[in-house]
Amino acid sequence: MTIAIGKSSEQPKGLFDSMDDWLRRDRFVFVGWSGLLLFPCAYFALGGWLTGTTFVTSWYTHGLASSYLEGCNFLTAAVSTPANSLSHSLLLLWGPEAQGDFTRWCQLGGLWTFVALHGAFGLIGFMLRQFELARSVQLRPYNALAFSGPIAVFVSVFLIYPLGQSGWFFAPSFGVAAIFRFILFFQGFHNWTLNPFHMMGVAGVLGAALLCAIHGATVENTLFEDGDGANTFRAFNPTQAEETYSMVTANRFWSQIFGVAFSNKRWLHFFMLFVPVTGLWMSAIGVVGLALNLRAYDFVSQEIRAAEDPEFETFYTKNILLNEGIRAWMAAQDQPHENLVFPEEVLPRGNAL
């Protein structure tokens, strides 16, 4: 027997290897390399939003109250976009607009760009986190692929759309009522609901909800257990040793209901992935089109005939008039920097006004 005495053959770890060991260590909350992007960005985005909705006014940018301090509640508080005059400035705290003055920076709308940019990179970090963990446990990266849908929508609505317009001012502010205002704006100024990309997005999201409900109900329906004591609530027993979900029974059921049914789990679950993600991506593509002021369907022949014949009206022509009403009422309120003044006689008035 030979005994070798000497130095270990292991090389001392470099900085990268040491960081890799620490970041990817198995712990209660995984950090990973993606965490270097995710955690700081998520912290700053959420912290900026909480700060803005609690303390910061939108008086200087929109002429509005937008914080709890001013009397707003959770539904009406918001971190609002910068003024239109600031165009696409990044509004850095140390930039020429705020010049390091935190109060002035908040008044100018600097928190909005802060939250939007950190939020976007935080979402990207979360997608990378799913990819990194999938690699670590040898899964395929479909979770990360699925999460690209919400990221595409966020980036298109909050970043690309205002970049195509005159400034960040026309992006949505971060708040519940503020998002509703933005939806009304999209309809009135872009006829968004008649846009085929919006239609595909609605089909994707509502179709995904339908698929999710059908799938959950079908799995619950086809859980079975051998023995005499089986009942509905035994299906929730976590101590059952093995899977007792019957794909064959589910296939027979839906074949009788619809005449067609998924024949294997892979195709079924891929379809459940494909429908919502494709819908979200189509919506994002549509918003990029709106950033460039591309129009939705225009049925000009109906508009001309409606203008010539007072008795001719379609749901399309009614919607066009409603959009004109949204624009007339909204523009003066929504864009105070334009100093728009419309005579009373041109404003549409309903019976309740």
UniProtKB/Swiss-Prot annotation:
The modification Phosphothreonine is found at residue 2. One of its GO terms (molecular function) is iron ion binding. Fe cation binds at residues 215, 269. The modification N-acetylthreonine is found at residue 2. The chain crosses the membrane at residues 41-61, 125-141, 153-166, 208-228, 279-295. Coiled coil: none annotated. InterPro entries: D1/D2 (IPR055266), Photo_II_D1/D2_sf (IPR036854), Photo_RC_L/M (IPR000484), Photo_RC_L/M_CS (IPR055265), PSII_PsbD/D2 (IPR005868). One of its GO terms (cellular component) is chloroplast thylakoid membrane. PSII is composed of 1 copy each of membrane proteins PsbA, PsbB, PsbC, PsbD, PsbE, PsbF, PsbH, PsbI, PsbJ, PsbK, PsbL, PsbM, PsbT, PsbX, PsbY, PsbZ, Psb30/Ycf12, at least 3 peripheral proteins of the oxygen-evolving complex and a large number of cofactors. It forms dimeric complexes. This is Photosystem II D2 protein. The gene is psbD.
